Amino acid sequence: NFWLITLNSTVTYILAYLLIFYTNHFIKIALAGNFGYDVGFNHSQVFYYIESHEWTHDAVKLIYSAGPIMILILGGLALIAFWHFVQEPARIKILLIWISLHAFNFLFGSLMIGNIFKEGVGHVFNWMYLTDTAKMIVALLGFVGLLGTAYTMSKPVALSANSYFNQLSERNFPFFIT
């Protein structure tokens, strides 16, 4: 039973991650195509086959910010769907929890790290010509968002235990955590 729980949780973790990751890529590719930019992609990144002077402010802002916004919406919808199934012993709750966790971590992590290292959504803030102080405030908002995600998602993660266990006790709690 433990190995089945481990396998199910691992598979749903990976599926949720891939859904979030490739949704972001699909949004970038679709919007770059709308601006007439030639793009290519592989399993891990998107390549833009244009010169640096061909980028416009609107294109950068839309291409690099639409993915995280769509991911936030997807994570919010997954969390709402989780609360709909919270009393049911349905295993779909595990997938919904992982989708919302990955979505919120993707958004707030990219606000924090992308802004500091000028990658991903950080390009938007560079093209907005924000000062270093404003960029640091955005990075701190990303950090606070990550902390808020951890605080907010602790209860849904604990409530998802009824997907596998009828009652969470001291005997089966270590199996739930792993």
Residues covered by each model-derived region:
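Hydrophobic transmembrane alpha-helices and their immediate loop junctions
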Residues: N1-T178
